């Protein structure tokens, strides 16, 4: 990608670390990761890149498309049901723009430059990030009509806990804000645990149990019925970016589309 060999890149990195007098990267089982000092240096470099690109854009012909790659980290449901279907207009306007959509995994950090932009559930708790409220979404308990016919409809939380329950694989959750099931009942134990909210919708639709589902994923599915409808939950989506890169044309195009 950089047009240089690994050996050359390693040599330049070692020279840079020697010059600044500290380690900028650490090695681990999955590759390399920026140290705190490395992240601070990247902030300065990205600010310089943003200023250079912004200055260059002054001389670009009006209407000229931006180019390059923007990486967006987003929850699966938002990425597949909201973001992806709305990209056509943006990419038609900027045909030289490439977009990478990646999942938010446990330990994800936008501050460590793991993505250019992130869509997060709840306000980010990392400093030095710009955030903007995108909107809210609702969640509720649902079962399939076939499940209710076979096993009955719970009318209390105690009755609910005696049913087959569907939820997340809890130790893979990148945010506790997603663990709505524990808000329903601290004793909640998922008989079927699925990492994917879309997978949970499909499992409930198949009659495998009762789950807390994102309502924007349901598409007014007539095969599902609300369980304990008085239990409603809301969460917020925030658009989060690095202040130092917001003026880079390709990132600005994505932030404003």
Residue ranges of predicted features:
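Residues within the DNA-recognition helix of helix-turn-helix
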Residues: 5, 12, 86
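The DNA-contacting recognition helix of HTH DNA-binding domains
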Residues: 6-7, 80
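Conserved amphipathic alpha-helical core elements
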Residues: 16-17, 224
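A short LG(V/I)-centered, amphipathic sequence patch enriched
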Residues: 17-34
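Alpha-helical linker/hinge and terminal dimerization helices associated
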Residues: 19-20, 41-63
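Central regulatory/effector-binding core of bacterial HTH transcription factors
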Residues: 67-127
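C-terminal regulatory
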Residues: 112, 124-237
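A late-sequence structural motif
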Residues: 230-257
């Amino acid at each position: 990608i950089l047009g240089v060999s690994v050996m050359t890149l390693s040599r330049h990195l070692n020279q840079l670390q020697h010059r600044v007098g500290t380690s900028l990267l650490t090695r681990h089982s999955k590759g390399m990761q920026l140290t705190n000092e490395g992240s601070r240096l990247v902030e300065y470099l990205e600010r310089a890149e943003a200023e250079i690109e912004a200055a260059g854009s002054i001389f670009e012909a009006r209407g000229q498309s931006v180019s390059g790659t923007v990486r967006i980290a987003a929850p699966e449901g938002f990425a597949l049901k909201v973001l992806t279907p709305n990209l056509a207009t943006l990419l038609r306007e900027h045909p030289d723009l490439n977009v990478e959509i990646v999942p938010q995994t446990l330990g994800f950090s936008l501050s460590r430059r793991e993505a250019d932009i992130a869509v997060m559930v709840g306000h980010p708790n990392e400093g030095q990030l710009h955030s903007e409220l995108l909107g809210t979404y609702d969640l509720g308990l649902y079962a399939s009509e076939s499940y209710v016919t076979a096993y009955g409809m719970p009318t209390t939380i105690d009755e609910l806990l005696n049913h087959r329950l569907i939820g997340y694989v809890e130790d893979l959750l990148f945010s506790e804000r997603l663990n709505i099931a524990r808000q329903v009942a601290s004793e909640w134990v998922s008989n079927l645990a699925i990492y994917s909210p879309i997978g949970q919708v499909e499992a409930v639709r198949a009659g495998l149990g009762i789950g807390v589902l994102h309502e924007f994923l349901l598409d007014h599915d007539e095969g599902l019925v609300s369980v304990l409808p008085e239990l409603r939950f809301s969460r917020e989506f925030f658009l989060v970016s690095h202040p130092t890169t917001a003026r880079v044309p390709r990132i600005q195009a994505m932030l404003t589309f």
